[in-house]
Amino acid sequence: MQLSHLLLAFAMIFVMTIIHTPQVQADAMADADADAAINCRRYPRHPKCRGVSA
């Protein structure tokens, strides 16, 4: 395999990693919000759960 093909492959992997990373972070934040809602269902009187619909 030529060196240019290897460089192209690494460049594509690098770009796809950069594109995919924000989606992973958004999913992690959504999971944290879901966990907070579950905790508010279990502990509805907790001060942080005021105004959260169960």
Curated annotation (Swiss-Prot):
All disulfide bonds of the chain are: C40-C49
Main location class? secreted
Is Secreted found in the keyword set? Answer: yes
* Keyword Signal appears in the UniProt entry: yes
Q: Which family does it belong to?
A: Belongs to the formicidae venom precursor-01 superfamily.
| Organism name | Tetramorium bicarinatum (Tramp ant)
Tissue-wise, where is it found? Expressed by the venom gland.
Q: Name the residues of the propeptide.
A: 27-36
Its name, as the record gives it, is: U7-myrmicitoxin-Tb1a
- Biological classification of the source: Eukaryota, Metazoa, Ecdysozoa, Arthropoda, Hexapoda
- Outline what the protein does: Venom protein with unknown function. Does not induce paralysis when a high dose is administered by intrathoracic injection into the blowfly Lucilia caesar.
GO terms (molecular function) for this protein are: toxin activity
Q: Which residues form the signal peptide?
A: 1-26
The alphabetized UniProt keywords are:
Disulfide bond, Secreted, Signal, Toxin
Protein's cellular compartments: Secreted
What Gene Ontology cellular component terms go with this record?
A: extracellular region
Q: Name one Pfam family in it.
A: Pilosulin
